[in-house]
């Protein structure tokens, strides 16, 4: 039986698995994927979405922290992180506190969406609902650790402040 906060979703067609890639600074979900299998391609798709959103070759200095799941410690996944110039960081085995932000996001996802709208019939229904939830989460969900504002606002505030500092320095 899946652990309660892990993003597994029961549907009439069987179990689905959900992967999120989260920007820790602003708590923004920058990549996600729903899959009927736990293969490496599943988490690679979420990673590719995040890499496209964040363009690490432009910004540099990115660190990817994850649990010790077989998908994220696979050779292909590690190679892709390296190609993108992203530093891998892997947590302790069985330590939910080591990846507390991911556990929190997974729990919110299940409480605010999955359990509230169950039962789920199809993968497509879960994908569409997840797309809508991620957009709502990033743009409207107030989060205490970032000052009771949504992740998109926290990120916009950071870049606005950065632009001011650059203008002052020029």
Please name every model-derived segment:
Residues 1-170:
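Charged DNA-binding/catalytic regions of mobile-element recombinases
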């Amino acid at each position: 039986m899946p652990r309660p906060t892990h993003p597994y979703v029961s549907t009439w067609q069987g179990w689905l698995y959900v992967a999120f890639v989260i920007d820790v600074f602003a708590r923004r979900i920058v990549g996600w994927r729903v899959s009927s299998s736990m293969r490496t391609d599943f988490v690679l798709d979420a990673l590719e979405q995040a890499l496209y959103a964040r363009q690490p070759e432009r910004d540099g200095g990115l660190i990817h922290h994850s649990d010790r799941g077989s998908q994220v410690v696979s050779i292909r996944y590690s190679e892709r992180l390296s190609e993108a110039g992203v530093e891998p960081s892997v947590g302790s085995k069985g330590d939910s506190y080591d990846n507390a932000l991911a556990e929190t996001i997974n729990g919110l996802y299940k409480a605010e969406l999955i359990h509230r709208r169950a039962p789920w019939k199809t993968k497509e229904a879960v994908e569409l609902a997840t797309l809508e939830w991620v957009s709502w989460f990033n743009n409207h969900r107030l989060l205490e650790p970032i000052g009771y504002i949504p992740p998109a606002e926290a990120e916009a505030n950071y870049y606005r402040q950065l632009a001011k500092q650059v203008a002052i320095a020029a």
